[in-house]
């Protein structure tokens, strides 16, 4: 027991590692219900003294398992509009590579300066998420009465649904998905909310289909970013300068996977307001810590 209490990993004691695991489980559940689980785990890591870039990289890599679990849960909806994936996944892929490369190659001081702004942007999106989701739902309902032949209708067969979705994928949608990929590869948090807003406006699909595509795109951005992190960390950086904390990655992966499985059960019993309040509180904590580090050094 004493040996367990004295155990350390990356300079973090057993108690702090257990806290990371709990935060990762909570993040997995949050992602299942309202998204933005990164704003749970990232502040916890930063508050423990983990450098911001290492916290972002390790967190993003650890959450990948939960991302693909969420996408698998929407596999039926994704298959219905699979015709859009051939153009949207490459856009997310390229954006994720660029965002991840910027994160891991620019001086850490740049991220330390930019991250507080991105946290504020993420918190604004989290706060606005209910109104955005309600607007997207209203738009989906209005589309059912829309005479525009490109709009999905309840009576459409599978081939028609796929064709209408594919026809709606123009350069504006591809460009915005690409930019969302850069944001996701660089900071991770709230990219799902951003994608839902984009696709709610431009993609001819139901709300559930758009949510399925969103889950898959987020998973690909995070996977692409993770591969980029590893390549840059091991091919460019010196061993003493590497930022990936593999122990933290493993703990978050286990926790977020467990959280993803229990999220649906817990999420139906907890108010989204409560979950969102926790995200905002932890996001403000991270903002305070980073501003203090920025001002004090």
Describe these PLM feature segments.
Residues 98-104, 177-187, 225-234, 286-297:
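Hydrophobic alpha-helical transmembrane segments in multi-pass integral membrane proteins
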Residues 47-48, 100, 104, 113, ...:
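Transmembrane helix-loop junction
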Residues 81-91, 115, 139-141, 212-219, ...:
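Cytoplasmic-side transmembrane-helix entry/capping segments in multi-pass membrane proteins
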Residues 2-51, 140-211, 218, 250:
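Selected transmembrane alpha-helices and immediately adjacent juxtamembrane segments
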Residues 61-117, 121-122, 223-273:
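Selective hydrophobic functional segments
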Residues 17, 60, 115-119, 123, ...:
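Residues within membrane-spanning alpha-helices of integral membrane proteins
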Residues 68-79, 117-163, 285-297:
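Transmembrane helix exit motif
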